[in-house]
Amino acid sequence: LLIGATPVFWAVDPSYIQIIIPTTVLSILALRFYTPPPKLYLVDVADAAGLALFAILGAQKALSYQLIEPVAVIMGVITGIAGGMIRDVLTPTTPFVMRSEMYALAAIIGVVVYTLVRSYIPETAAMITGMLAIFSLRVAAIYWQIQVPIIKFKDKT
């Protein structure tokens, strides 16, 4: 909507809904019957995959509207993070983006990788490369508790 892409792509192409609904059902079933390893939960892995997919799709959409790469990076990051925030609002959890593990930074790095390599390799390969970068960084950040430094401001009182 920010770039004038109307109607919203997932409202016209049923393939997105056809992927989202079974994935949601499988995630619910998996969480019910699966005992995750102590440091990495299935919801974290699914969130990393969703962040990777939607960040790259958002950047690709921006580039398809002839927007410049820095804007595509911003749009990709917004798209990737917004989906996770909507999910977090609907569930009683602390939003992943508000936790200290690398989240937005993983999306930024992965989308930058995608925009840099897409001129040199086929589009699908560039998308997969960007998604793998985001997914790998996010999962590594969760598993090894890699944190982004928090900027603290002095209290003026």
What is the meaning of each model-derived region?
Residues 1, 26-40, 85-95, 141-152:
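C-terminal ends of transmembrane helices
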Residues 1-3, 74-78, 82-91, 113:
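Short, structured motif recognition centered on aromatic/hydrophobic residues
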Residues 2-12, 57-71, 116-126:
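Helix-coil boundary and interhelical linker segments in multi-pass alpha-helical membrane proteins
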Residues 8-22, 68-80:
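Structural signature of hydrophobic alpha-helical transmembrane segments
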Residues 13-20, 38-50, 75, 97-105, ...:
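Cytoplasmic-side transmembrane-helix entry/capping segments in multi-pass membrane proteins
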Residues 25, 29, 61, 81, ...:
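Alpha-helical transmembrane segments of multipass membrane proteins
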Residues 53-57, 109-115:
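Hydrophobic, membrane-inserted alpha-helices
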Residues 127-140:
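Small-residue-rich transmembrane alpha-helices that serve as helix-helix interface/gating elements
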